[in-house]
Amino acid sequence: MAQEGQDIPTFKCVLVGDGGTGKTTFVKRHMTGEFEKKYVATLGVEVHPLIFHTNRGAIRFNVWDTAGQEKFGGLRDGYYIQGQCAVIMFDVTSRVTYKNVPNWHRDLVRVCENIPIVLCGNKVDIKDRKVKAKSIVFHRKKNLQYYDISAKSNYNFEKPFLWLARKLVGDPNLEFVAMPALLPPEVKMDKDWQAQIERDLQEAQATALPDEDEEL
């Protein structure tokens, strides 16, 4: 199985969301990607090559991280151009970061059009959750995939990448055969809490969408 070179299928993955939602923490969990990251000075971004091993061979996501530029307004189109997939992240302890998800989605699809997108609610290890599962409906309206994640505990780290890999390769049965080397968890997910948030999410997904036509 190839480790280096251009023979690994490689996809540009754009990582967006408000500042402070944990995007950089998330992408830095993957140890080899952090070690091999490249800085693109013209755009002020870090590109992390995240390799995953699947039952069809290795796959690489070149994950573009904004390095905090989003705090100064929108991102330049060069960040999005040739993006083949995307992760939009918000912080479940901050309602405003979820309210801004439609803006990030709009910017993404304006440049990238019809690419697979995963919405991630980060920091679910924190019990003081402000954005409840039942409030998270944007992905259902726009046909995106959604995952609760906790970057600091590694909870569901691989899920967004597995979903994107299946879409990009066109194989719904694609599986990761080994987990990448991740940094040790900084926090532990409480097992009862984890079971609770998984139940809440299942219930929310089974609930009909509200009739009103508002974005959120």
From Swiss-Prot:
Query: Where is region (Switch-II) located?
Result: 68-84
Residue ranges for the region (Switch-I) are: 37-45
Q: Which GO terms describe its molecular function?
A: GTP binding; GTPase activity; metal ion binding
Description of how the protein assembles with itself and partners: Found in a nuclear export complex with RanGTP, exportin and pre-miRNA. Interacts with tamo.
Residues where GTP binds? 18-25, 36-42, 68, 122-125, 150-152
The cofactor binding remark recorded in the entry reads: Mg(2+) interacts primarily with the phosphate groups of the bound guanine nucleotide.
Cofactor annotation? Mg(2+)
Give the keywords, sorted: Cell cycle, Cell division, Cytoplasm, Cytoskeleton, GTP-binding, Magnesium, Metal-binding, Mitosis, Nucleotide-binding, Nucleus, Protein transport, Transport
Where would I find the Small GTPase Ran-type domain in this sequence? Answer: 7-171
Transmembrane residues, as ranges? none
Q: Which gene name does the record give?
A: Ran
What result follows from mutating residue 24 to N?
Reduces numbers of granules containing Nup358/RanBP2 and annulate lamellae containing nuclear pore complex components in egg and nurse cells
Q: What is this protein called?
A: GTP-binding nuclear protein Ran
NCBIfam families, A to Z: small_GTP
Summarizing the function annotation, the protein's role is:
GTPase involved in nucleocytoplasmic transport, participating both to the import and the export from the nucleus of proteins and RNAs. Switches between a cytoplasmic GDP- and a nuclear GTP-bound state by nucleotide exchange and GTP hydrolysis. Nuclear import receptors such as importin beta bind their substrates only in the absence of GTP-bound RAN and release them upon direct interaction with GTP-bound RAN, while export receptors behave in the opposite way.
Any single GO BP term: protein import into nucleus
Q: Where does it localize?
A: Nucleus; Nucleus envelope; Cytoplasm; Cytoplasm, Cytoskeleton, Spindle
What protein family does this chain belong to? Answer: Belongs to the small GTPase superfamily. Ran family.
Source organism per entry reads Drosophila melanogaster
List residue numbers at the site (Essential for GTP hydrolysis): 69
